[in-house]
């Protein structure tokens, strides 16, 4: 078997004092926290598209990436090489999961029938490699946005033929996701939206989107796919206005169409900020709705208005993200998928590894800090005290549905002063700083 990364050793944990860029400083996969190895808390995953398909191309320049599989000119040889490279990459980084779009792993043919046959050959290669590896599929999905046929959308297209093609493509993607033991299946509507309402039948598009998702649910039941269906919200890009704008919008859509019981959310950090939210906001919304399924781990540049998909390095963000995951009970059929790409000028193979290492370290550290915050209940206690008025007296009656406008008016009408608690935001931010510093100091 050809080795694709001979210059890269198996990445080891060396501790926080290490200056080796090809070593973990905070991520020890076998470190046991709360009775479970860290790797099982975090469930890291490699995104096939960014790691093995992205070439460093941008709207203003040609590809820059130096990749060992680029030596292959035949599309099938390159596809097989990428699969083999994936397993070597995961094993050297001690990552146990990967995710893919159908068109990432195999090239398209002239017809859908031909494309499916090509896809089957690559899936067989993946299955062969899985036999000798502990690498598993976290989730699969279909690329319903790159091909020109999807210029008007897939489930929300104006063409019944395109709708049929998209349905057949998702049918096949569900089949191979099941065949490979995927824990979930993601729906991301990059072209499900509009550029202008001047040419859009908004009602029909939304109804057709619901019909499409319902068909997917029904087919999954038919073939016995028990993985978790996930919606990945994003407000814009490539489409000006996308229907799965954020968690709240997508949940309202699912609820309105009686689909909410079948779906959870795959939350991406950079999508949250594009929607004008923090990463934690989207995770909190999903958590309180009981719909936090999985995470696409990355970060954006707040000075730029597009999806930069950078590797996560912000300890505050990862701490607050893992706080929400822990409070939700941890991942079940989900994990932390690095939907992140190295910068265009970081074109060496080594940079691929370094990007994943820093992302894994940052989330590992964030988890350790968040675990202490949850265990010590410092935020819980403050919030409970802040809202204490709803635990007793008239507040308790409000919560229990025993108060109405007349009763509340009678209660408040002669009160002269209302004393409010301080929000203490500065204190809590200081407390978060202290937990970060203290946790790092205690690490070996």
From Swiss-Prot:
Cofactor(s) it depends on: Mg(2+)
Gene Ontology biological process: D-xylose metabolic process
PROSITE patterns with a match to the protein in the record: XYLOSE_ISOMERASE (PS51415)
EC number(s) stated in the UniProt entry for this protein: 5.3.1.5
Domain of life (superkingdom): Bacteria
Subcellular location field: Cytoplasm
GO molecular function: magnesium ion binding; xylose isomerase activity
Binding site for Mg(2+) 2: 268, 271, 307, 309
Alphabetized UniProt keyword annotations: Carbohydrate metabolism, Cytoplasm, Isomerase, Magnesium, Metal-binding, Xylose metabolism
Gene Ontology cellular component list: cytoplasm
Note on how the cofactor is bound: Binds 2 magnesium ions per subunit.
Active-site annotation: 101, 104
One of the Pfam families matching this protein, by short name: AP_endonuc_2
Main localization category: cytoplasm
Reactions catalysed: alpha-D-xylose = alpha-D-xylulofuranose
InterPro entries according to UniProt: Xyl_isomerase-like_sf, Xyl_isomerase-like_TIM-brl, Xylose_isom_bac, Xylose_isomerase
Binding-site residues for Mg(2+) 1, renumbered to this chain: 232, 268, 296, 339
NCBIfam families found in the cross-reference section: PRK05474.1, xylose_isom_A
Family assignment from sequence similarity: Belongs to the xylose isomerase family.
Subunit structure: Homotetramer.
Protein name: Xylose isomerase
